[in-house]
């Protein structure tokens, strides 16, 4: 999607140019409350607003003295770091808050466009790490202080399939490869750098295959790269985003795709995918946890930073976190402890009752949870996938 044009450039012009080495404004220079209500331009590169927009709107309604207006825009994750760099090089910070997955986080850290939030502003988030669920706290550590986790889920990797065409789901990577060979062009996953299910599959395979070092895509993934190259012989193309794989599953152009808990539940709720599809796990199963973050670009004014820090702290309150159950998009969703489905809006409770799968609770409790790759390693993994596996077949039907 194209970015919304003309994002309150007048207000944003008060932001200073970047180039401070990633440091946020001096914490002492950022007031507890802005001197006057601010306007914020929020860029979502992760589909995160589906989970958090109501939290943000609730904050705006409760704190008109902090926030006067919010403008939302969306963009693909791979475009985020370049957009922020162009703004900061031009001395005009038009984007004030980014909602991103680990992909945008990794790219933003790599190109130096994000402000350091922690430990600089730890005082604005009392007991942050203790309040997170344990696997969510590990996902927060991946930020290196350049963001604050707002939602979390165990993710996958899951196989999602049409049971009419796949009577018995593959129970291991070898069985998946055998199935793909026997049914060429009927299995698919999306480009990992722009797809939660795609990168969860990529990062989960080293555990499934018993690779040498699951945290080192460069030197420890020999089995994974060989497997993906072999599997790729039977994949027609790699869509540039997850939604296309869902539509292809629904239309019958493919019969099996990679998925996650949220990408299974939410498209069935929306009707994108028929409610008859099934999911399965491969063994030895390891969840690869996923999260989405609030990222603050460099070059903002102290008032803007003040408002954003208050907003993020608000989003981490348990009553706001309960909104993250949403329609199962990031199931379960809450990053902080002790936020139950019973605390969620009735609509969310109804959705999970109708479209959730009882086995997910059992699987989440039963199998080990591994964090996504750290930022630098994730960028390496995406680059290597583009070179070795699928770069020439992305989006080309």
PLM features: what roles do these ranges have?
Residues 27-106:
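Early extracytoplasmic/lumenal segment of secretory-pathway proteins
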Residues 158-165, 206-208, 291-304, 323-327:
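A bilobed periplasmic-binding-protein/Venus flytrap-type ligand-binding module shared by bacterial periplasmic
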Residues 322-397:
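C-terminal capping/gating helix-and-loop segments adjacent to ligand/active sites or protein-protein/ligand interfaces
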